[in-house]
Amino acid sequence: MYETPAGWLSSLHPIIDGEVCEDRHHEWGFTIYRTEYGPSTDHPWQRLLQMIQTHAHKATLRVNGVTDDDPVFQQLWSLFRLDAQADTALSGLNVDQLRLLYNNSNGNLPPMNTDFPLHRIFLVADDVTFADAEPSTIKAVDGDYRAENYIPRNNWNGGQRYFGWMPMRAHEVVEMWKHLDYDCLDRIAPPTIKGSHLVIWENDCY
């Protein structure tokens, strides 16, 4: 499935008071929180960020079917941002605590996509991420998840299947962004099995 840089740019126009603002664009990308700290994770964290950035650039070129010198692509890529949040105050926070932080940040620069429906997702690099010598698996977390909306009335179909997040490959953030253009995370995420996330999401369209 291919996109065009112009079409992608048009999807980034903000809507204010019901009107599309064609002279403005949202930045696109994700906030990523680091929750594991210590000397052994400092360099892997930097390598993880660089890997995400590098693969995002390549994937954006590939999805658009263009080369790096395309002026519309250059405008699109200039709007990409990986908002890396690393502070020892985040150490050990779980996805529910991070979701509260994401939704209640009162700083001058709010997390990415808090005002961008369908893309209200953030990323997490935690102890599971840094258990690998070369971190490659992160969590994608639904900023709008409410557990009561996903608890089934009975367990005939195996109980609750979605818990507001999914594991994913860190090199596929662009592909996930494109999936989010059309679907919510609860439809994208692989179903859990007895509450366990046994399947890591991987792109199958872009």
Task: Name each model feature, range by range.
Residues 1-163:
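Extended, charge-biased low-complexity segments
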Residues 149-206:
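Acidic, proline/glycine-rich low-complexity IDRs
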